Amino acid sequence: MLFDRLIVHHDRAPTSAAMNMAIDEALLEQATLPVLRFYGWRRPSLSFGYFGKFAEFAKETKTRELVRRWTGGGSVWHGEDLTYALITPASDPASAHGPTFIYAALHGAIRDALLIEGTETQLAADAAPKVSDACFANPVRDDVMHEGRKIAGAAQRRTRGGFLHQGSIQLPGLSESFRDRFAAALAPGIQQTSISMQILDRAAILAAEKYGTMEWLHRW
């Protein structure tokens, strides 16, 4: 398994796109153990990678909240998906693994959990030719595929403090048991907790001063 212990947060109350990104960054700043966070979105949203050009997505502001991620990758529609983040502090042995190893390990865990739930999927053997800036239009190696369609993708960022992996599973209605099986495939020791007020307070600052600002949204 990837970890010995794993903290799991189930965010029951959907929040804004900016706050979702801010919570992930705050967890990366302060986590002392690996954390798996599942969360939802207050409104239909679109997140796009750090280097994405806002002008390409500006028209979506009429119907969706837009947010620039701290991680890379393409654009992702949110609302009916299951969104998650994995935070690995630099102090954890798993942080020594490269990004492709972690990517494959997480998507392998998703594949195995889905199979137990009755949905057979495969990991993509190779990257497909890029056809757009939409994440789910462009399978890369080890993405989760179902009936020829990419259903799980992710983006990553590494800092001195650790590793952030933000993922989306585009299968509406995934059960609570799927989340439990996904987490159990990553570590033998699972601890389910709520996010601390310290993290939420820090996230509120990051949302107000970074992710919710026009400067950040229009960065490129």
Model-found features: residue ranges?
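Long, positively charged amphipathic alpha-helical accessory segments at protein N-termini or as interdomain linkers
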Residues: 106-134, 157-220
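Short histidine-centered catalytic/ligand-binding loop motif
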Residues: 85-103, 167-173
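Short connector loops at helix/strand junctions that flank enzyme active sites
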Residues: 43, 61, 77-81, 139, ...
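Residues forming anionic-ligand binding surfaces in small-molecule and nucleic-acid pockets
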Residues: 70-93, 165
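Short, acidic Gly/Pro/Ser/Thr-rich loop/turn segments
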Residues: 45-46, 55-56, 91-93, 159-160
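Residues in well-ordered beta-strands of folded domains
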Residues: 9, 28, 37-39, 47-49, ...
